[in-house]
Structures are given as structure tokens and as C-alpha cells.
Amino acid sequence: MSMLLYYFASAVKSIQFHVDDDIIDKLNYYYTTAIITVFAILVSAKQYVGFPIQCWVPATFTEPMEQYTENYCWVQNTYFLPLHDYIPHNYAERENRQIGYYQWVPFVLALEALLFYVPTIVWRLLSWQSGIHVQSLVQMACDSRLLDLESRNRALQTIATNVEEALHVKHQVMSGNRLKLLNLIICTRSSGAAVTFLYISVKILYTVNIVGQIFLLNTFLGNRSKWYGLQVLNDLMNGREWEESGHFPRVTLCDFEVKVLGNVHRHTVQCVLMINMFNEKIFLFLWFWYFLLAGATLCSLFYWIYISVVPSRQLNFVGKYLTGIEGYKMVDSQSLRRFVFHFLRQDGVFLLRMVATHAGELPCYELAKTLWNNYCDNKEGKMHDV
């Protein structure tokens, strides 16, 4: 397990920021994944290097018997009873009070970290099918800030040429045995919305993941209340500690049987789960973090749908880089609409937004100006051909 988490941590460390997403995406696939991985390493270190459980055994027990008892209770689960409650004589009732999640905490945390990274894997694998390699083009725009004027203009012209070729590629028919999602992405290339459609789909995937993670957290903890974090905080504010609430109890009970000379002897021992002190803080933090992240991710999804679907938002965004600039003050609204909706289309506007977000306003302005010049040149060329 320790080696597995070591390799997993190395993989997380190798994750790098990309320039084809926004800060909410990074909160999901980078920061949250890193936080959960750190928690998984801390818990696994305590479980597999330290002493996760220690039991109070009868004085007649030898050291090997004590070790056996602790190992057995760790593997077979323990159950919680308030300190002053009587131990039920019915063993079935004891089993109903069992706590069986603490052994699986590192594995569950590793699974959660992996699930948070799945949407960005989907984005990386499928974005190249859209026709526009957003990561490479935006990175080129970022790098152009360090170049001289002539080299920067050549770089921006290269970006503009790639965008034009990708946006105006003819529709290609996919064979029936391809994945439906890939087929849909290729089909949307002809409408210039493939990248936008894929990005919003990934946003939906992030939203579904974080909502599912909240339900997974409550299910894993076996908590009947969906407001686990608020319930724990309320208990702490009212001075109701784990001894009463049973949330991540430090002291539990364990039943086990030992066969001696053909006779079965049943023992009940009291055990200390120090690991639950860490688990309580970790899951309380994650519960609140997940809810905050769910709200931010949902707002980000609605925001991107709004700016991608509402035509006026696209016009206003592109227009601010063309109007008010010397030589572009006379751009009429009809020409702007044709430039945005027939030349750039949704994917072109999406790329400009990413350039503005990661490279800054100046590279975005220069790229928009280059695309506008190319659009005007193409329009004049067609008029001369006629």
C-alpha cells in the first residue's frame, strides 16, 4: 500500500497546469487531487507504519496474544457504545453498531483523487478531435509575450491560420463503429462549436463528479444525515463530543473468539483508534470543501453556458477588442456579427477567451486584430473573384 501511494503521489506531483481551462477546473483536477493525496499518505503512514489500534487486554494475555487481538480487531471491525451504556447481550445488536470504514480510508481517498482527475483526462484525450488544439495555441500566445515584435506577429499569424483552417474544415463522416461522443464532436466541427461543446460537457462531468463525491462521502461514513459536516460542527459547538455522538469514536469495543483445547472462549476488549482523530478532521474538511467546490463548479458551468450560448455575450467580448482601436472604430454592427458568427463562430470566441485568460489582454487584442485582418482580406478576395 505504501508503494502504491508513493507512485500515486509521484503521478500527482507530475501534474502540470494547463492553459486550456479555468481556475475552477484547476481547483478540481489539481488542488483537490493534491489535497486528497496528501491526506491519503498521512493516513496510510499512520495505519501501516505506526499503531492504528491499541486494545486493553486481560493481564493473562501474552504479547503475541495482544498483537493477535489488535490485528484481529483492526481487520474484523469494532463497534461503538457510549462509555456509560451497557454492552448488549445480543451479539447481532453489537454487529449493527460496527464501524467498518477506518481500514479503507486510504483506498477511498485514493479513489476520490482519481475521480477528480478523470474529467481532465477526458478533456485531454478528446480535445484534439475537435480540430483546434487549444493547449498548444494558447501556449504559443503566452510564449509570444517574450518575443520581439516581428516574431510575435509571426506567431500570432500562425495561430490565426491554424484557427481558420480548423474552423472551416469540411464535415467528415464518421464510420458507424466509432464512439458516439467522438462522432458528435466531429459533426460539430462543421458548425464551429466542437471545442465549446466538449468543454461544457467536461464542465458537466466535473459537476456530476463533485455531487457524486458528496454522496459517496456520506455513504462511506454510514451517516444517515446528508449534512454530516454541519451536524459535527453543531455537536462541537454544543459540547457534544464523540463519546456521545459516535462520530469517529476514539474508544471502541471488539468481540473475538479463541479456541483453546477444543473450547471456544469469547472475549470483549476495549480498543483505542487514534487514527480516527485524523479521520475526523480530514473528512470534516473534505465535506465542507466539497460543498464549496460544488457551488463554484456549478456556477462556472452556468457561466460558460451563458457566455457560449447567448449571442450578445460573444459580440460584446469580441467587439471590445475591435472597437475603440485606431483603424477599427468604423466597424459596423453587421460586419461584427458576420465576423463573430460566420468567421470565428463559437470555437473561435472560446479560443480568444482562453488567450485573454492565460496570456493577457494584449495578446488577445493582437490575435483578434490578426483574425479580423484575415477576415477582411478573405472578404475582399472573394469580391475581386466575383
Curated annotation (Swiss-Prot):
Superkingdom of origin: Eukaryota
Main location: membrane
GO molecular function annotation: actin filament binding; gap junction channel activity; gap junction hemi-channel activity
Keyword Ion transport listed: yes
Membrane-protein topology: Multi-pass membrane protein
Localization in the cell: Cell membrane; Cell junction, Gap junction
InterPro entries, A to Z: Innexin
BP GO annotations: monoatomic ion transmembrane transport; positive regulation of locomotion
Entries under PROSITE patterns matching the protein: PANNEXIN
Expression across tissues: Expressed in PLM neurons (at protein level). Expressed in the nerve ring.
TM annotation in the entry: 33-53, 103-123, 197-217, 282-302
Alphabetized UniProt keyword annotations: Cell junction, Cell membrane, Gap junction, Ion channel, Ion transport, Membrane, Transmembrane, Transmembrane helix, Transport
Family: Belongs to the pannexin family.
Quaternary assembly: Heterooligomer of unc-7 and unc-9. Interacts with F-actin.
Name recorded for this polypeptide: Innexin unc-9
Chain's gene name: unc-9
